[in-house]
Amino acid sequence: MARQFPLEKTRNIGIMAHIDAGKTTTTERILFYTGRVHKIGEVHDGAATMDWMVQEQERGITITSAATTAQWKGHRINIIDTPGHVDFTVEVERSLRVLDGAVAVFCSVGGVEPQSETVWRQADKYGVPRIAYINKMDRMGADFFRGVSMIADRLGANPVPIQIPIGAEDQFKGIIDLVTMKAMVYTDDLGTTSDTADIPGDLVDQANEYREKLLEAVADTDEELMMKYLEGEELTEEEIRNGIRKGTIGLKFIPVVCGSSFKNKGVQPLLDAVVEYMPAPTDVPNIKGVHPETGEADERHSSDKDPFSALAFKIMADPYVGKLAFFRVYSGVLSSGSYVYNSTKGKRERIGRILQMHANHREEIPEVYAGDIAAAVGLKDTTTGDTLCDDKAPIILESMQFPDPVINVAIEPKTKQDQEKMGTALARLAEEDPTFKMHTDQDSGQTIIEGMGELHLEIIVDRLQREFKVECNVGRPQVAYKETIRRAVKAEGKFVRQSGGRGQYGHCWIEIEPLEQGSGFEFVNKIVGGVIPREYIAPIGQGIEEAMQNGIQAGYPVMDIRATVYDGSYHDVDSSEMAFKIAGSMAFKAGAAKADPAIIEPVMKVEVTVPEEYMGEVIGDMNSRRGRIEGMEATGTAQIVRGFVPLSEMFGYATDLRSKTQGRGVYVMMFDHYEEVPKNIAEGIVAKRAGA
């Protein structure tokens, strides 16, 4: 089967935003207009095509990023709808990694909300070009221009409107295209018919003012255009469009469009903007990677002629076909039934079938090409972030980094049967979601599950019951404390055992030092002259890593350290991998005790919106929770208080806030960073762990 759409006419985009800004509704409308869905699904009916998990339909939010493909004006658009709730940031992270561009949806009333900032930072990290779509222009309090200035102020971006609205709230009638300087006026409710007309007289000055700003931004992308603009010459429509495309892909500015997805207004012009201004796979830099054996830098071009390379960005358990691996093809061609090499795991895998996903319907296809996003059946060993490639030209592509869980609960199966099923079910769920982890508590024997927030764990438990028919009792949420060290130390680990027959001998000297937050664990080998043979180096690292799971002070995992092995000795007969693993573990424990250990806790970024009269009480309450107020701002009749509060102080906050503000206060929080626990609280934590 030949390629249907040339690579230049492929667009891989994500739809990202704050919860309730209207992402899923926008995606639904896109699918409706591009002819993929014959009846529009509404989120509040629980019938949206992209929200296909039962939990999503009940809660009216998007949890997993559904991938679908659509066609518009001779282009293929692969769309990933991402969740806006902070507990599911991992889904946003992995989608952005495999996309070339994104549509950021903002609510015209709320503007830039906290999760918008988080998602924006994630997109900045991956250098993803964006279009901003200011949605819900028909809502009470809709203000397009306030939205634009918030994008500039809060996100530090450079928004350039390429459209402005005609009216707002219930008077929202259409949009003015600043490229063609024509008005698009909607004449029916479905938004499928619109008339092109001249700009209404009362908006001519405003349209000219914003067109001037657009021309200035466009001229800035190209020297020739700048000369033409400065000499007062008119830029042609084609020059303006090329300039917008260049500025968008070069991350110089963010084109801003507007509409009301629910009322079907502005969706087709948004699709036009995606096709015209978002990058094709050929417009983005080559994908970088390393050779699995030599570690040398390598790259792949976005072309069918290059050797095959792809990144698995999501694993999903499907009730009909089993394990589905979603992947993005960066180069080459892949046929179903063929073998691929998983260079991350060093294993060959056979692709059973290749499926093109359309939310929750699927279509089997014989092959995929560079730039495509598809799902494969049959990959047994592949997990999120793995590279799939041609074994004759192996490469490991840059993967993704996921945050550690910040909250955990103990779960107990209700019956013996549940116990047997629970292990398998949890393993399946952990395979799908890299921010969900589980372990068995060594002291109590309980199964502990960890995640990014209460909602995240609630949904995991819900899926255990629904999909896997496992009934379990759930404990109270606990904070995921961690430990770290504050100074560098050197320490020795020596394991010698002589008890008849072959003995055991492992001996090493290591230096451990603190790293910057979020660095994880680094293991460095500085052994020279073979004082420890090469095959025993990795076991030392494994021993250290295992010892790090139980910290010195209160038994919490230790994070952000570098361990360097620099000396040691071995015995020709008695040394073994196990002996050196134990020596590594002993050295770490000895060193960590002297390295000024500290307990650290997750600190959340909290944003509370309350009517002005409750401000004093809310701020006082935040301070009593060891909070640090960062700033305040007024929006209409409400005030927004921003600050950082330790997660351990936030349990039950929703109820307290409701009672303090008579149900009128709302808040959002997301994990921000780890911070050292004050001495008096750390002592309490240690005592509690010792008593437990």
UniProtKB/Swiss-Prot annotation:
GO terms for cellular component: cytoplasm. Keywords: Cytoplasm, Elongation factor, GTP-binding, Nucleotide-binding, Protein biosynthesis. One of its GO terms (molecular function) is GTPase activity. It is found in: Cytoplasm. Residues 8-282 form the tr-type G domain. GO terms for biological process: ribosome disassembly. Residues 285-304 are annotated as: Disordered. SMART domains: EFG_C, EFG_IV. The keyword Nucleotide-binding applies. Catalyzes the GTP-dependent ribosomal translocation step during translation elongation. During this step, the ribosome changes from the pre-translocational (PRE) to the post-translocational (POST) state as the newly formed A-site-bound peptidyl-tRNA and P-site-bound deacylated tRNA move to the P and E sites, respectively. Catalyzes the coordinated movement of the two tRNA molecules, the mRNA and conformational changes in the ribosome. Belongs to the TRAFAC class translation factor GTPase superfamily. Classic translation factor GTPase family. EF-G/EF-2 subfamily. This is Elongation factor G. It comes from Desulfitobacterium hafniense (strain Y51).
